[in-house]
Amino acid sequence: MRCPFCAHPEDKVVDSRESKEGESIRRRRECLKCEKRFTTYERIDEIPYMVVKKDGRRERFDRQKVLNGLMRACEKRPVSIGKLEAIVNEAETFVIDSPERERRTSEIGQLIMEHLKKYDKVAYVRFASVYLDFKDVREFLSELQDLLNHKDPAAVATVKPIK
């Protein structure tokens, strides 16, 4: 390990312990040349969880991206950040539980819409208008009509497994 201060290649480990989360090892090191101390972290290099986009591209699952989309949909709505975090947690668990370590964005979006439909119909419509990518006003009105016709907020489509 090179010293970040003088670039000397040799150091000694002064202290070593697990991080607070238990997912890494924190090591306190001292340079053998300049005697300055610095901290390093050692962790397992994990295979990332992936999402498959509509066009077939794959990218890493980004929890913050999901939360940002939900926050935009729920802006100025009475949906607590706690509920949004719970939805994001469920979406993340849904991706993590996949044996292939990937899920389609359509599956994740459907799961999120199911929750929004229960919590706040306006937020649901906002999210659906972006997620479902309506081609014209008729498609949008059709979705609104379906929403108005459902008396039971739990009456929503189920998530289909990846094939």
UniProtKB/Swiss-Prot annotation:
unnamed zinc finger locations on the chain: 3-34
Protein name: Transcriptional repressor NrdR
Top-level taxon of the source organism: Bacteria
This protein's record includes keyword Oxidoreductase: no
Coiled-coil ranges (or none): none
Biological process terms in GO annotation: negative regulation of DNA-templated transcription
Cofactor(s) of this protein: Zn(2+)
PANTHER family linked: TRANSCRIPTIONAL REPRESSOR NRDR
Role according to the record: Negatively regulates transcription of bacterial ribonucleotide reductase nrd genes and operons by binding to NrdR-boxes.
Residue ranges constituting the ATP-cone domain according to the UniProt record: 49-139
GO MF entries: ATP binding; DNA binding; zinc ion binding
Annotated cofactor note: Binds 1 zinc ion.
Family membership noted in the UniProt record: Belongs to the NrdR family.
Pfam families cross-referenced by the UniProt entry: ATP-cone, Zn_ribbon_NrdR
Alphabetized UniProt keyword annotations: ATP-binding, DNA-binding, Metal-binding, Nucleotide-binding, Repressor, Transcription, Transcription regulation, Zinc, Zinc-finger
